[in-house]
């Protein structure tokens, strides 16, 4: 190893502890270039510390506080677009380093944001000279790209894309990722089940770089070589590889597993085959290339749950500060028989019909209603007694005077066999 000499001081990049300068030598030469610094190099495998693997929260979303400058806050609504659930769907280049599509705005300077009107009141309110703190609910393992990273991109950032960086941890040097080239874009073609990358990326994501090193390979073989070398080097040194990627805004932003992981949850045999390394029947490429998936109900529920958990305090049972509105509990209606205490019927706000006319609790004529009730039998025995008194008559049917036989003549009847005597007997009996 070659050491650099500068002013008689040896500089080693592996130095971790440097002792102070020694006492001057006995010859009295105190010049700086004659000083000797004792160096104890402690470069070893034990000195390289790797970052511990973080554990995903139960909701897969966490609150993140973002600071916005006063000049950017004035144009916040022009730079960022949100939907009716206060989820960001579009971010301008100015704030791409602070916000990303999929973030749900929950607080502004400690004030809860429940709808777009609340956000509009905060933005259009009095001009603020200090920075504004915006709390958003974001996927736990995704981070926004810095301005330096955005400026280094080969293609200028587009507002319809979701740019992010995510760390993929691995102890074996592999992450279970398969890439492909499509129109000079590096896309995720396949993600193996129960691998480090299945909670970080989705099939269809575009890989832009790894650890600030952009992918510039022009062939599939060169691409695989570049990705393998960069990831292997990063994982061996740090224990993880930071992937810079982007995806369409319509894709779900939750860390829900990719297609391979979803199949492993539904089909256990498939996941077992992946773990054992056995050969599995290759699926049609159209089944995997049809992703990314749209936002689903599970992602929305997890994001809302993470938003509500901000207000849960272990030592108290306080509820989020919101407009509760009128109570939904009403007194039950009384029994139909007494007009006192009966609540008025519900009537539409724009209806001109009188409330008394819409009432269904009491009939208009009490005597008529009683007469109807009396004439109506309460038991089935009354119907049976009425049936017994009624007479049943049958219409008289004409009697048959003669029964003819299939044999036309009497003489032919005598010529029949003895076994056919029953036919002659019947004819004689009824003739």
UniProtKB/Swiss-Prot annotation:
Protein's organism:
Caenorhabditis elegans
Which InterPro entries does this one have?
T15H9.4-like (IPR040264)
The cellular component terms of Gene Ontology attached to this UniProt record, alphabetical and capped at eight, are: chromatin
Its lineage opens with: Eukaryota, Metazoa, Ecdysozoa, Nematoda, Chromadorea
Q: Would you say which domain of life the source belongs to?
A: Eukaryota
Q: What is this protein called?
A: Uncharacterized protein T15H9.4
């Amino acid at each position: 190893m070659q050491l650099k000499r500068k002013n008689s001081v040896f500089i080693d990049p592996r130095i971790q502890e440097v002792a102070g300068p020694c006492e001057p030598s006995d010859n009295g030469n105190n010049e700086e270039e004659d000083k000797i610094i004792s160096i104890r190099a402690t470069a070893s495998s034990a000195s390289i510390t790797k970052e511990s693997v973080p554990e995903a929260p139960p909701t897969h979303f966490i609150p993140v506080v973002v600071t916005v400058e006063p000049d950017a806050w004035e144009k916040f609504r022009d730079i960022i677009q949100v939907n009716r659930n206060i989820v960001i769907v579009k971010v301008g280049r100015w704030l791409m380093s602070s916000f990303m599509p999929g973030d749900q705005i929950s607080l502004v300077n400690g004030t809860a944001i429940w709808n777009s009107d609340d956000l509009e009141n905060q933005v259009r309110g009095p001009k603020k000279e200090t920075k504004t703190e915006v709390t958003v609910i974001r996927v736990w393992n995704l981070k926004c790209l810095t301005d330096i990273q955005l400026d280094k991109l080969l293609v200028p950032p587009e507002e319809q894309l979701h740019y992010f960086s995510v760390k993929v941890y691995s102890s074996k040097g592999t992450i279970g990722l398969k890439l492909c080239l499509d129109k000079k874009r590096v896309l995720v073609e396949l993600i193996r089940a129960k691998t480090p990358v299945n909670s970080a990326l989705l099939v269809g994501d575009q890989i832009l770089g790894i650890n600030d090193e952009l992918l510039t390979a022009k062939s599939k073989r060169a691409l695989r070589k570049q990705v393998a070398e960069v990831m292997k080097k990063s994982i061996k040194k740090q224990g993880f590889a930071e992937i810079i990627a982007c995806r369409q805004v319509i894709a779900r932003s939750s860390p829900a597993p990719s297609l391979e992981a979803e199949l492993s949850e539904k089909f256990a045999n498939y996941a077992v085959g992946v773990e054992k390394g056995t050969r599995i029947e290759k699926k049609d490429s159209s089944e995997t290339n049809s992703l990314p998936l749209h936002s689903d109900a599970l992602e929305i529920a997890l994001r809302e749950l993470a938003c509500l958990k901000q207000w849960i305090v272990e030592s108290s049972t306080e509820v989020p500060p919101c407009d509760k509105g009128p109570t939904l509990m009403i007194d039950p209606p009384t029994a139909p028989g007494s007009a006192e205490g009966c609540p008025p019927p519900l009537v539409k706000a724009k209806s001109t019909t009188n409330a008394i006319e819409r009432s269904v609790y009491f009939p208009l004529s009490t005597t008529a209603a009683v007469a109807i009730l009396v004439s109506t039998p309460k038991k089935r025995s009354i119907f049976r007694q009425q049936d017994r008194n009624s007479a049943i008559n049958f219409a008289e049917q004409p009697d048959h005077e003669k029964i003819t036989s299939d044999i036309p003549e009497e003489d032919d009847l005598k010529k029949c066999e003895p076994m056919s005597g029953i036919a002659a007997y019947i004819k004689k009996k009824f003739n």
